[in-house]
From Swiss-Prot:
Signal peptide: none annotated. Gene3D superfamilies: Ribosomal protein L33. Belongs to the bacterial ribosomal protein bL33 family. PANTHER family: 54S RIBOSOMAL PROTEIN L39, MITOCHONDRIAL, LARGE RIBOSOMAL SUBUNIT PROTEIN BL33M. It holds the Pfam family Ribosomal_L33. It comes from the Bacteria. This is Large ribosomal subunit protein bL33. Keywords: Ribonucleoprotein, Ribosomal protein. The keyword Ribosomal protein applies. It comes from Cellvibrio japonicus (strain Ueda107). One of its GO terms (biological process) is translation. GO terms for cellular component: cytosolic large ribosomal subunit.
């Protein structure tokens, strides 16, 4: 089953992306480099829960 997740910026800007992932095939926490428009550069985004 695909679950919705939130990708939080590690730059501390409060910016986030929402996406989904398959928990069965990828049980570990997701970390991916994406663009943060607040600091205008690519930073690591880490998985967090949607509240």
């Amino acid at each position: 089953m695909r679950e919705k997740i939130r990708l939080n910026s590690s730059a501390g800007t409060g910016h986030f992306y929402t996406t989904d992932k398959n928990k069965r095939t990828m049980p570990e926490k997701m970390e991916i480099k994406k663009y943060d428009p607040v600091v205008r550069k690519h930073v690591v985004y880490k998985e967090g829960k949607i509240k």
